[in-house]
Amino acid sequence: MGMKVLWLCNNAPGAVRSALSGKPEGGVNWLDHVLSDLRNQGVTLRILYRGTGTPGQLDPLCSYAPVPETPAHIYQPKLEEAFRQELRCFQPDVIHSWGIEYHHALAMVNAAQSAGMLPRMVASIQGLCCRIALHYTDGLPERALRRRTIRDILRRDSILRQQQVYAQRGELEILALEKLSHVIGRTDWDKANALEINPALTYHFCNETLREPFYIGQWEYAACKKHRIFASSCSYPVKGFHLLLEALALVRKTYPDATLAVPGRSFLSNDLKSRLRQNGYENYLLHLTRQLHLNDAVEFLGHLSAEQMKKQYLQSNVFVLPSTMENSPNVLGEAMLLGLPCVAANVGGVSSMMGQKEGILCDPVSTNQLAEEICRVFAMEADAAAMGLAAQVRALQTHDPEKNLKNLLDIYRLLSGKEN
C-alpha cells in the first residue's frame, strides 16, 4: 500500500506483548484485530505503546517501542521531544493516537504541531474523561465518598481523589481536542461532545472491530445458567457495580436463586493481604454486599482471557451494563455479537450501539428499573433469544471487520493525500 502510519497506543497490543515475552499472548485485545488487518494490507507501522520493554520488530514492516508509563493526569513536556525525534526518524504519512485520555496524546499533538504534521494526525475518541468525571460518583451515598482504607491513606487516594484525577485528565484531553484537526468517533455522543469542545474539528466516523473470538458463537437459553447475571467490571465507580448490587437484591425478591458473576478479584476476601489492598470503593462494595445479604450471590472470576470471557457470556442469562457513563463499551458489543440478551443504562453513546429492539435500555442510576428489566429478561425465558438475535445482527454490522478496515484506510488515505 506504500503508506507509513505511526500508532500511539494506551497499552501494548497482544502481538507486541507476545514478542516481548517470547510466549504466545493469551490476553489479545481488540486492537490486535485491527493490527492484523493492517499488516495484511502492507502498511508500514510504527507502534508506540505505554509501558516497558525493549524496542523491536514484529516483521520488516512493523516496529514497536515503549513510552514511559507515568501518571495519566500529569503532563510530561520531555515526551514532546521524544515524539519529535520519532517523527523525524519515521516520517509518517499518518499519525494515529488511539485515545486522548492519557497525557501522552497531548504530547504527540504538540510534537506533530511543531513538526508541521498536525494536519496528518487523527485521534480516536475512546472515552472522554472530561465528561466521565462529571458522573464518576453517580449513585454513591455520602458515606461511600468519605470511606478511606489503609491503602488509600498510604497512597493519598480516595474516590473523590480519583474523580479529581479524571477531571485533570479531562483538562489535557480538552487541550488536545482544541488543537487537533481530525478525530475518529462512532457515537452521536462522542461527536456532539468533540464538536462542542472544538467546532472546527473534522469528525470521521469509523466503528471498532472487536476481539476475534466473539465473532464465533451463539447464546442459547437452554445452555445458559438460569437467572445468572454477567457484568464486566467492579473495579471503579463509573462502572456502576454498586447500582447492580442494589438491583440484584431487588431481583432476588422475585428470583431468590439469581446470581451475579463479574471478572476481577474478590472484594469479599477477609485475609490480611486482601484487606490491606482494598480501596475505598471496594470497601464500600464489601459493606453493601453484606448489608444486602449477597455474599453467596456474587461470583468473582479473576482475570479472563477473551475465550474465557466468551464462555462466561454464553453461560449467563443476561448481560447487564449499569455504568454511569460510557461511550461505546466493547463489552456490550461482545455480548451483542454472541446474541446474549442485554440490559444497559442509557448513558453516553450506548444508544448508538443498541436500540430498544436489540436490548433493553434503562434510565441512568435507576436501580428499581434495572431490577425490573433484569426480571423481565428472566421471565422471557427462551423468548429472550429473539432480542439477542436482533442484537447480534446489529453488532455484526457495527463491528464488521472488513467495513471498518475500509473506513479506517479511507481516513488514512485522505489524511496522507494518497487517496488514489
Describe these PLM feature segments.
Residues 87, 311-316:
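Short alpha-helical donor nucleotide-sugar binding micro-motif in glycosyltransferases
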Residues 356, 360-367, 376-381:
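Conserved acidic donor-binding segment of nucleotide-sugar-dependent glycosyltransferases
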Residues 6, 220-239, 245-250, 260-263:
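Conserved donor-binding/catalytic core segment of Leloir-type glycosyltransferases
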Residues 324:
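Aromatic "clamp/platform" in nucleotide-sugar-dependent glycosyltransferases that forms part
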Residues 33-34, 129, 145-182, 192, ...:
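Membrane-proximal helix-turn-helix segments that form the acceptor-binding/catalytic region
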Residues 274-304:
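Nucleotide-activated donor-binding/catalytic signature segment of Leloir-type glycosyltransferases, i.e.
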Residues 1-54, 62, 116-117:
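N-terminal subdomain of nucleotide-sugar transferases
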Residues 341-344:
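Short hydrophobic beta-strand element within catalytic cores of glycosyltransferases
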